[in-house]
Amino acid sequence: MAKRCALTFKGPMIGNHVSHANNKNKRRLLPNLRSIKIQLDDGTTKRIKVAASTLRTMRKGA
């Protein structure tokens, strides 16, 4: 399963681990995914993975 938001398609980013000696090693910054149930128009429910930032926007109603 891809680590990607089902609504906004946010996915992993590439960054660096930086030590005190300023050595840089590559790392993946993963989105904060949450599993939620969403009700479809026909009344059935489906489980999708949504980023936490998207979930906050949905709950805010914006």
Curated annotation (Swiss-Prot):
Identify the InterPro entries for this entry.
Bacterial_rp_bL28, Ribosomal_bL28, Ribosomal_bL28/bL31-like_sf, Ribosomal_bL28_bact-type, Ribosomal_bL28_sf
- What highest taxon heads this organism's lineage? Bacteria
The alphabetical list of record keywords is:
Ribonucleoprotein, Ribosomal protein
GO CC annotations?
Answer: ribonucleoprotein complex; ribosome
Cross-referenced SUPFAM superfamilies? L28p-like
Q: Name one Pfam family in it.
A: Ribosomal_L28
Check the record and name the PANTHER family matching this protein. 50S RIBOSOMAL PROTEIN L28, LARGE RIBOSOMAL SUBUNIT PROTEIN BL28A
HAMAP family (UniProt xref): Ribosomal_bL28
What's the protein called, per UniProt?
Large ribosomal subunit protein bL28
Look up and give the organism this protein is from: Helicobacter pylori (strain ATCC 700392 / 26695) (Campylobacter pylori)
